[in-house]
């Protein structure tokens, strides 16, 4: 079998189908675009829906992709099984009304078995087909040449989700050998498609040829489609001879780095620790890519999934003796593994690490206390008659210590306990009834609180006010009820006028304080949202009693507001600069304005070059340093458009709009807060540029003090590098590194030449011990080598030496067994086949292998069996000669 990296396998798949006329489609964002039915992109075909339903016609009806995907329906199994993951890649080839079975089945076989491609052993491949799908059976048996006993007919091989397109499918399985099975050889489930660990599904080909009608009938589709999916992690585990997906190069670097962070723990030392290592490796991949694509931890939807994954990883870090926040330290490892095809984690590394670290630090505050409480709760539940954790206890862990219910559920399962889920739900409902905020209703999909809808009082937002503002409190909402006084924990307030900006248009809300007439702090403003009737809703933590009708002093957090103003004006400059550098086809596709950074999404079919990024950054800073006044005009939409204002796609504008102008460089409709002059921004620095999805790019940038910090941090890094490479000045660093690289390459070349000489010398020693086995001469020995490549090189030396007819070389490498068998023409004519010999020997050292008649190789887990395996080969050589 070929030795391939995961990156090589991925690229090989795309190259194969590109050769067969397919358009290679970039992986879409994990966050579905225009598909509210999906929380995450969970398969390759999920991104093809628009093509298969006919809403969009593809440029090429043959498409291939490697699609990053997230599935979270069985998070609790991750780490406990060989194949479960939350984040995975799905390799796929798709036909939108183009080719069908007679093309796709031979292609699949060619890719899997051809030496040019994966080169898997055909004898180890099995397929399943739908019993009535005689066409697929014919293609596999009569065209591909698969034996009957390698084709299994299963009723389950029909893809149907109700009304709509459907059809039979064919799954391809790889036989990992009975030694890797978890059921007995005579078990009824021991077959391809059964519940067993021996036959690993690697590819599913769906033949979408019918339409399932509402009346239950199936009719032929006029245009037949192909949808296939191959799990990258699964096929890589086969190629890299890994027991599970986690021992591949997609996970092991993360696991090795986690070992360094742990309290002396080592992977493969015990089962419990292995589960923790696997959970951490999987979850950091998922959260890194999800954050890169725009998801952030929160208490709902995708954000809740991220929060759960991060906290589950942190809990397992504790089990490995890791103290404090650590998951963010693994992000660079994820980026390095995946950068060849997915550069976004490397591009957004600092931001991803910041998000994860902040989330970890929030959880770490209560983690230790929460774990102690959990241990006590479990101990008490074990003493109870019903062995059940009460809903009240589970809710306390959730509400006070931030333990998602699912984590407590997993801990209970591991301890052999149950949880009173009904009791937990009742506690959750009671809490919502006690302290539910109107904000929760506003932020849910399309729902608006009845109480807020009935508030008609006018409230005016004053843009320019940053100093203290006196205002009358006209409405108080507590627990979804209008009240005259607030003396509790939380409240929602409406004033007759306010300087607090409510979140809108990508700009987050102002924070600040509310004082009484005596200058005493009565409330902290933690968020501001728009009410149904457009008043600004101030969500506050109540410090002292608040009364309706009283005058209060409203103080905006000026530092936060300044950061928001600077970054919002900077997004306008950035938008204009992108359109000037990339072209006017570039449009804003989304934005986020925070006090300490900005995120700007824009339409673009291609990544920006380094030169383009530098040009955009330079242009923005030139406009900042030109000290241009920022002018705002309130007018009607038509007048605004005549002024040249850009209207954002998908935005709805009322009768009155606000136009923000920066000379003739930028004119946009915008309701956000802005600088009075561009020079207040100071400077802008682009931190990263990456893909969000097909046709959308994302820039993350910082301004002012954050930009200065970003530059100085990198200057410090450059100085460290300068010192490390002993460069006289910073300008010499690149040349110095190039010189070091040249020296390193020269040293590596010398080392390789020396190694070749050593191997040649070893070959001379090994090849002098020649045995006569009937009519054939045999060299059979265990070699002292560093790797499988050295073993193969010795075999190559043997070919040119003409020392014997048969070569059997074995070696122990890194605790694993390896064997190579080579035959000359005389041995082959005598009836021997290297592949047959290796298959006989491999089980003795706990492995498997295969190859061609003249050369074969195998690997295994038990080096102690190599001596007996060599003896077995010699016996076979004697018995199998004609």
Swiss-Prot record:
It holds the Pfam family tRNA_SAD. It is an enzyme of class 6 (ligase). Keywords: Aminoacyl-tRNA synthetase, ATP-binding, Cytoplasm, Ligase, Metal-binding, Nucleotide-binding, Protein biosynthesis, RNA-binding, tRNA-binding, Zinc. CDD domains: AlaRS_core (cd00673). InterPro entries: aa-tRNA-synth_II/BPL/LPL, Ala-tRNA-lgiase_IIc, Ala-tRNA-ligase_IIc_anticod-bd, Ala-tRNA-synth_IIc_core, Ala-tRNA-synth_IIc_N, Ala-tRNA_ligase, Ala_tRNA_ligase_euk/bac, DHHA1_dom. Binds 1 zinc ion per subunit. It catalyses: tRNA(Ala) + L-alanine + ATP = L-alanyl-tRNA(Ala) + AMP + diphosphate. Its EC number is 6.1.1.7. Consists of three domains; the N-terminal catalytic domain, the editing domain and the C-terminal C-Ala domain. The editing domain removes incorrectly charged amino acids, while the C-Ala domain, along with tRNA(Ala), serves as a bridge to cooperatively bring together the editing and aminoacylation centers thus stimulating deacylation of misacylated tRNAs. This is Alanine--tRNA ligase. It comes from Lactobacillus johnsonii (strain CNCM I-12250 / La1 / NCC 533).
